[in-house]
Amino acid sequence: MKRRMHRKVGGAYIRLGAGEIRNNLPEEVCAVQIEGLSWFPGHMTKTKRMIAAEIGHMDAVCEIVDARIPQSSRNPDVDELTAGKPRMIVLNRVDQADPAETKKWAAAFRAQGFAVLEANAKGGAGTEKFAAAVRELLKEKLAAYAEKGQVGRTIRVMVLGIPNVGKSTFINKVAKRKTARAEDRPGVTRSKQWVPVDATLELLDTPGILWPKFDDTEVGKRLAFTGAIKDDVLDIEELACYLMDYLALHYADVLRERYKIDVEEGDSGYDLLEKAGRKRGFLM
């Protein structure tokens, strides 16, 4: 890894001398500068229009969020777009999240009136509970249909969320077949797709949508860390250093175990990134 020779501080660039040590630089010099970060390609605007057009035909909405960043991975526009519809939040990737924090978030979302399901879409855990959870969420509506003689009426659920949160993978697991295209990168799903789960349940897979501007730069960083934003619009080294700083502060033991490195007091994110790179043979 090549050490950067300049650092942007308050609109100016400071040259780093060959003998300077990063830890001795002012704190603001080491700060990640991603103010104004956004990624909102044209297809996301089309997706918002499609959601608005289709929502009236839906019985319920399932919002997939990343269990590692539950609040940051919730698009603030979704509440308005889906107003009035029964809602379920699926906390995906719980296998990669802090279990204690996941429980707190699940309880918080339930307190807000959402049905909540914890899942690991890639491994399949939790996905087998989805169909029953949807029917429980809609039990009053289904009972009303039954009274009108509409037994067996198809339930239609819109599945939405930010890019690369695992929507298509989740749908494929629920449907028990690979119907929706899924890859570990944002922006793969570009159009809506209906996926039947059983004789009376259909899911509408939708492209991931962000919002035009992140007012909170911390939210932007978290979305970048978890792959919701395309790498080619990011400064990957800056973000990696910031993430290492965060992990050292909150999950030092996990960092040590994952990369088999020493995490010492005073280590900067750059130091830790360099240690990890050397440990894995990427640096000489």
Q: Model features per residue range: what roles?
A:
Residues 121, 171, 201-204:
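Conserved active-site beta-strand-loop modules that form the wall/rim of enzyme catalytic pockets
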Residues 1-9:
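Short Lys/Arg-rich cationic patches that frequently serve as NLS/NoLS or arginine-rich RNA/DNA-binding motifs
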Residues 63, 89-91, 159:
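Structural beta-sheet core signal
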Residues 2, 13-60, 68-77, 81-87, ...:
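Helix-rich effector regions associated with P-loop NTPase G domains
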Residues 66, 109, 170, 205-206:
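Residue-level signature of catalytic and energy-coupling elements of molecular machines
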Residues 97-158:
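Canonical P-loop GTPase G-domain recognition
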Residues 152-154, 177, 192:
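Short coil/loop residues immediately preceding or within conserved phosphate-binding loops
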Residues 157-176, 206:
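Glycine-rich phosphate-binding P-loop
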